[in-house]
């Protein structure tokens, strides 16, 4: 980490998990400041935020695969610890009962380019009312909940997407990718 001035450190590395660093004795009595992030901000490489005490912090995480998670520690000194807080958000939770049902759910959600998260046997995605209603109509049994989203599957997350395309929209919510197929988002 480089310090431009005493107010604005530039965070370039994730030092570890808060609980693990406390267990190792690297964090003892230092005050812990939190940087609150929405789930989608944790995917960004360059970001400027403010801690819960008003300290400005800038992130430049350029190493491949560096993604911020809840309770990541990004700064430690004798006087201060800065840790990440991923804020809970509204989500859709699916609990497929079989492997084919899981595969179909992931396939259909992926076709809609929605970020997808797995937690045990649950499929989780950010809440979106049209998506929720579509999942209900498709025979899934979605539940609305509040969760911390962390680490989207790389195959379909915004920064992990491996291709680009242009597309157009009509006035009824349908979407065209230039390949002769229209679908609704």
From Swiss-Prot:
Alphabetical list of InterPro entries matching this protein: UreE, UreE_C_dom, UreE_N, UreE_N_sf
Region ranges (Disordered): 153-185
Residue ranges with Basic residues bias: 162-175
Family designation: Belongs to the UreE family.
Gene Ontology MF: a single term: nickel cation binding
Zinc recorded as keyword: no
HAMAP family reported for this sequence: UreE (MF_00822)
Gene3D superfamilies in the record: Urease metallochaperone UreE, N-terminal domain (2.60.260.20), UreE, C-terminal domain (3.30.70.790)
Pfam families: UreE_C, UreE_N
One Gene Ontology biological process: urea metabolic process
Chief site of localization: cytoplasm
Location in or out of the cell: Cytoplasm
Record's keyword terms, sorted: Chaperone, Cytoplasm, Nickel, Nickel insertion
Biased composition range(s): Basic and acidic residues: 176-185
Functional note: Involved in urease metallocenter assembly. Binds nickel. Probably functions as a nickel donor during metallocenter assembly.
GO cellular component terms, semicolon-separated: cytoplasm
Name this protein carries in UniProt: Urease accessory protein UreE
Native organism: Haemophilus influenzae (strain PittEE)
